[in-house]
Amino acid sequence: MAHELQAKWHAYMDAPSAEALSGMLHEDVTFISPVVFTPQRGKPVTMQYLLSAGHVFTDTQFRYTKEIEADGRLVMEFEAEIDGKYINGVDIIDFDEDGLITQFKVMVRPLQAVNMLWQKMGEQLEAAKSA
């Protein structure tokens, strides 16, 4: 199951679409952000965060550098550069027996990257509300 989700996730990252993302998320998915204090619960809000992150990382040479999968979990380390700032992070993705994502946790370093992502994600989320 992990390999299927991993392949779907990579296909989504290569050609992001709301439809593809929606098909991977459990209705009660939880999104845990490095820049929001409380976990965000539910498919609509998780989609909003992940789609906004996709916009933030557009044209950043985002790439996964390491991937580990075991027992209903994918852990994928990533790197990117935004506005000349290096970003290193980890996506920790839990999934159920149907292959649907039940929790998506993002961890990011260094602190300058966290601060920049907080600003850029805020801008994207505001733009999404206005649209």
Where are the language model's segments positioned?
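Alpha-helix N-cap/loop-to-helix boundary motif
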Residues: 1, 13, 38-42
